[in-house]
Curated annotation (Swiss-Prot):
The reaction(s) this protein catalyses: aldehydo-D-ribose 5-phosphate = D-ribulose 5-phosphate
Domain of life: Bacteria
Keywords annotated in UniProt: Isomerase
Protein name: Ribose-5-phosphate isomerase A
Length: 260
């Protein structure tokens, strides 16, 4: 790795490194998508190489699968392994009960499928993602291409009847074109400002024709690992009801970090 890490990269680095500590030999592990998850994949590859671990990975996106294979991790499909011991992923927001908004990286559908098919979900993040109430980060909704504008209108009309602060729905763009997911769908980002009842919002969205899935991850996350720029991490375990601090060594010197 060249140069000094920025404070935010240092926070992501230590969160990802600590989360890899949950992985044990012989596990089937789900690999998340996004900038923080990419740090985790690199840490995992380094740990597997140094400790001679035998693990099987399932990726939540094409780009995560490519990174993992480049780093010599064994990547297979969810259909092949059927169920996972652990999934490690990032989040765009999390609240005090560890409910999440995910999908900023465009992989929410596969991320939710993989996380739901896991015994445990570990989320790696930094303190900026902690909120009292979900909704400041736009909520991604994956929609079928056919009739997407009608679907967007239905979404906005439906939001009139739920407890949210805003209703603007914007098609996600990339390089001047609609962003296309790995499944060939579009994403509509909902600028809700505040989600008073996440369960209600998730339920009504997924009942609409044309909606594939939304980025609310409710009762899925077990542990959040919050990285900090001083090299410390905070672990919040929703099942144990515990919160504790640890210090993580920051030494990004392995070959898996050489291109950063």
């Amino acid at each position: 790795m060249s140069g000094e890490m920025s404070p935010i990269d240092r926070a992501k680095y230590v969160a990802a490194k600590r989360a890899v500590g949950f992985v044990e030999d012989g596990m089937r592990v789900g690999l998340g998508t996004g900038s923080t998850a990419a740090w985790m994949v690199r840490h995992l590859a380094e740990t597997v190489d140094q400790e001679g671990m035998d693990i099987t990975c399932v990726a939540t996106s094409t780009r995560t699968a490519e990174l993992a294979r480049d780093l010599k991790l064994h990547v297979t499909t969810l259909d092949e392994v059927k169920w996972l011991d652990l999934t490690i992923d990032g989040a765009d927001e999390f609240d005090p009960t560890l409910n999440l908004i995910k999908g900023g990286g465009g992989a929410l559908l596969q991320e939710k499928i993989v996380a739901t098919a896991s015994d445990r979900m570990i989320v790696i993040t930094d303190a900026s993602k902690a909120v009292a109430t979900l909704g400041a980060f736009p909520l991604p909704v994956e929609v079928i291409r056919f009739g997407w504008e009608t679907t967007r209108t239905l979404i906005e009309e439906t939001l009139v009847n739920v407890d949210v602060g805003g209703r603007e729905a914007i098609l996600r763009m990339e390089n001047g074109m609609p962003y296309v997911t790995d499944e060939g769908n579009f994403i509509v980002d909902l600028h809700l400002e505040r989600i008073g009842n996440p369960r209600q919002v998730s339920l009504v969205l997924n009942q609409l024709p044309g909606v594939v899935e939304n980025g609310l991850f409710l009762d899925i996350c077990d542990v959040v690992v919050i990285g900090k720029s001083d090299g410390s991490v905070e672990l919040r375990d929703i099942n144990e009801g515990s919160v504790h601090q640890e210090q993580v060594e920051v030494t990004a010197t392995g070959n898996v970090f050489s291109d950063l």
